Amino acid sequence: YIDCSGFKRLLINKLTSFNKYERLINNAAIWGTVKHQSYKPCTVAAAQDYGWIWETPTWGRIGTGFVYCDDFLSVDDAENHMKKHWRSKGLEWKADKSVKFTGGSLDRVAVKNVIANGLCQSFIEPLESTSIMVICVTIKSISKLINKNKVWGKKESNIVSKVMKKFLNETMEFVL
């Protein structure tokens, strides 16, 4: 079974524990859009006093958000920060959503015949690209083992858990 039940962790929750990444102090994010024709072919991340802002340009708008620690900044203050940030560029930011989160990962990604993937497995930061990358690496690791060994057992669960723990720790270090 592949548990893709998000933060609920419906299958894997009783089989292993979730470890919070204590070094990742950011625990909240807000995001929205800016109407603007941008030609940057990449996502930009910019450090701020209380976190960081991302800008992902698409045709006709920029998806943008602010990741921060709510110990130091309220949601209202974060929204005001975003409005001021974009106003300084002559643009208007429209808030869409806000979320609180806990960065961390499961102690074991695979236990017996249950494999966790997606938000069920880990959460490092709210940029979708990080989560998509983790999902793809997990699927690739699983498929390589199944194609090689033609079975799934304790050995394969241990290998995937070890590979993903290393990958997730390296990804978390990169984000720091």
How should these model regions be labeled?
Residues 62, 121-124:
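A short, flexible beta-alpha/helix-coil linker loop
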Residues 2-84, 139:
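Predominantly flavin-linked oxidoreductase catalytic cores and closely associated redox partners
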Residues 1-7, 114-119:
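Short hydrophobic core segments
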Residues 141-176:
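Active-site-proximal substrate-binding core of FAD-dependent oxidoreductases
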Residues 97-117, 122:
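FAD-binding beta-loop-beta segment adjacent to the flavin cofactor pocket
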Residues 123-143:
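A conserved FAD-binding loop/helix module that cradles the flavin
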Residues 85-88, 145:
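Extended charged low-complexity segments that act as oligomerization/scaffolding linkers
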Residues 90-97, 155-156:
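A short coil-to-beta-strand element that immediately follows conserved catalytic motifs
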